[in-house]
Amino acid sequence: MSMMKSRTFCLTLLLAGVFAFPLQGWTADYPKQPVELVAAGDPGGGLDLHARIIDMAFQQAKLADKPFTIVNKGAGGGNVATAYMVTQKGSPYSLQVNTNRVLLNPLNGTTKHTLKDMTPVVRLTAEYEIWVVRGDSKYKTVQDVIADLKKDPKSLPFGIGTAPPCTDQLNVLIPAKAAGVDVKGLKIVAFRGGTDVGTQILGGHIPIGSTSLSELVALVEAGRLRPLVVSSPQRMDKLPNVPTWKESGLDVVLAHWRGIFGTPDMPKEAYDYWNKKFAQMSQSQAWKDILAKNDLQNAFLTGDKFKAELEKDGVLYKELLGTLGMLK
């Protein structure tokens, strides 16, 4: 090898090493500090639950040396959490647990932040919605409720677990519309989490609520609250006596997912790192046991597929809200 070729070859190796080192060093040392997991909901709600079971699964499956720092930002229907993430632009040390509100809120005009202002990392779970009343309520079937709503849509204020638009709200509007109820006349009251909805029902402040089962499992199992219908395609193991919307005569299936989002311009190395870590978590026995205990379905999707699903859902939500006159 000539002197010139030798020098060129050595320089090429040197440059390759220089440009490769930052990536290798970055991933080897990351995370150098605690990673905050921002729950876009208040303590006790579904998103808070997800943040805590994620942390639990990571510890039990030994996927992290340190626990997540869980931060609750439940105000504004999740908008406060998303706005906070925007302020952390480019940071690999902030992750957000959120749901389809990231698509619904911009359509309703409650936030200027859209899917472009976040980095979809993974979808984790799906669960289904219930209509729920107090254990001693006069309403025994969902048909009883719909009959009264047809007479007077304002007669039964519905409690939902977050600010509209949200899945809790859609679980009222979609079946009510399909049943011939004047949905524009419905009275829907938003509370700060499904747990709060349960408290309001038990206190007699509202007669009925629409929320996720996971947020009210203990009260349902104790018989203090009674589900009338579930939005799953088939009956759920935990609710063997509760009919689906389809069994109740309405062609409605509605899933409520939770996923992980990174900051805008999240470093690719961090994106890849968390895709790998959450994939490992989703396959762990610890996670499977936690999902079974909380009656959650594993709906894992990696970043690219998750983003594609979000874009597809965004089109559907826009069409639905437009039909209901809710676009702003």
Describe these PLM feature segments:
Residues 26-117, 164, 181-208, 300-301, ...:
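N-terminal (or domain-start) structured segment
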Residues 32-34, 268-328:
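An extracytoplasmic/periplasmic, membrane-proximal ligand-sensing/linker region
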Residues 88-97, 152-156, 202-211, 224-227, ...:
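Alpha-to-beta junction loops
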Residues 100-110, 173-180, 207-241:
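A ligand-binding cleft/hinge motif common to bilobed small-molecule-binding domains
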Residues 60, 64-65, 84-94, 106-196, ...:
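Hinge/capping helix and adjacent helix->loop/strand transition within the periplasmic-binding protein
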Residues 140, 215-283, 294, 312-315:
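C-terminal lobe and pocket-closing loops
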Residues 10-22:
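Bacterial N-terminal signal peptides
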Residues 2-12:
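Bacterial N-terminal signal peptides that target proteins for export
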